[in-house]
UniProtKB/Swiss-Prot annotation:
The keyword Iron applies. Its EC number is 1.11.1.-. Residues 267-286 are annotated as: Disordered. GO terms for biological process: cellular response to oxidative stress; hydrogen peroxide catabolic process; response to reactive oxygen species. Its cofactor is heme b. It holds the Pfam family peroxidase. Keywords: Heme, Iron, Metal-binding, Oxidoreductase, Peroxidase. Heme b binds at H169. This is Putative heme-binding peroxidase. Binds 1 heme b (iron(II)-protoporphyrin IX) group per subunit. The active site is at H40 (proton acceptor), W185 (tryptophan radical intermediate). Belongs to the peroxidase family. Cytochrome c peroxidase subfamily. Destroys radicals which are normally produced within the cells and which are toxic to biological systems.
Length: 315
């Protein structure tokens, strides 16, 4: 696996696209499972507990690594491991989320907003100390609308965002040994489109979960299913916004753009000490912004790549 220049995320995305070609895996593509990895790494965030989310890459350690909801994601992690080993300057947490957005784009989907700066837990002990218990927070496909709202509401998503994010079921397939369900949702499970919503409405259905059917049975969800089935551009726009929000969950950035120990910072009610932001005459190789001028989705901040030169990207 190729090593790319430190901070060259575009080159890294090209390497991720090469990884997506997996003739021996589902439908010959790792794309859908890379999207699922980014989703599950982020989707255990809680606004109440102030923990979980994409920061830390906690799925490398128990109990997240053995959570039944994450069954099969070891394939995605193993596909990315050679690339991470060849480019140790990027954290697992950043690579997992970057791989997810890259896969969506490569499979014909929208461009998802993404920023670097996530850190990795160095050990299981560090993950447990800073992340806490994030089990039983991911959607259960066998349940209905109330469960969906509970899961997504915990992360701060609206009904519209819930339906948009559910459109990720246009990709990949279920496996009986992982979820108890089997088969793809759509005809072409490696191409991102609005076909999932079209198939949800009366017509031919390949395979739908109870959580999928809840989207057309619930009076608040269904109008969005109908809108996205009729307008792929609208779906792409709303999905990009919702997925970009999803992968930022738990990423409490400091003024250098790096993620803080979100739970500890919340408990103490103050930010943690960080290395000073880079000098104002330096240009960020990620965004092209100068010095601390780049603005981030989770708050203002400087360039995380340049700050990385002055600190170790580990929790």
């Amino acid at each position: 696996m190729a090593s790319v220049k430190e901070g060259d995320y575009q080159a890294l995305k090209e390497e991720i696209k090469k990884i997506m070609k997996q003739p021996g895996y589902d439908d010959g593509s790792a794309g859908p499972v890379l999207v699922r990895l980014a989703w599950h790494a982020s989707g255990n965030f809680s606004l109440v507990e102030h923990n979980g989310g994409s920061n830390g890459a906690g799925m490398r350690f128990p109990p997240e690594s053995v959570d039944p909801a994450n069954a099969g994601l070891h394939y995605a992690i193993s596909f990315l491991l050679p690339l991470q080993s060849a480019n140790s300057w990027i954290s697992h947490a950043d690579l997992w989320t970057l791989a997810g957005v890259t896969a969506i784009e490569a499979m014909g989907g929208p461009q998802i907003p993404w920023e670097p700066g996530r850190l990795d837990y160095e050990s299981e002990q560090a993950a447990v100390e800073h992340r806490g218990d994030v089990s039983n927070r991911l959607p259960d496909g066998a349940l209905g609308a109330a469960h969906i709202r509970d899961v997504f509401g915990r992360m701060g998503f609206s009904d519209q965002e819930i339906v948009a994010l559910s459109g990720a079921h246009n990709l990949g397939r279920c496996h009986a040994d992982r979820s108890g369900f089997d088969g793809p949702w759509v005809v072409n499970p490696t191409r991102f489109s609005n076909q999932y919503f079209k198939l949800l409405l009366p017509g031919t259905r390949l395979m739908m979960l109870p959580t999928d059917m809840a989207l057309i049975e619930d009076p608040s969800f269904r109008p969005w299913v109908e809108k996205y089935a009729a307008d792929q551009n609208l779906f792409f726009k709303d999905f990009a916004n919702a997925f970009g929000k999803l992968i930022e969950l738990g990423v409490d950035r400091d003024d250098t753009g790096f993620a803080r120990l979100a739970k500890k910072a919340a408990e103490e009610g103050k930010p943690l000490d960080k290395t000073a932001p880079p000098a104002g005459d330096e240009t960020c190789p990620v965004s092209g912004a100068v010095g601390g001028g780049v603005q981030r989705a989770a708050g203002g901040g400087g360039c995380p790549f340049m700050a990385m030169q002055n600190r170790e990207a580990k929790l």
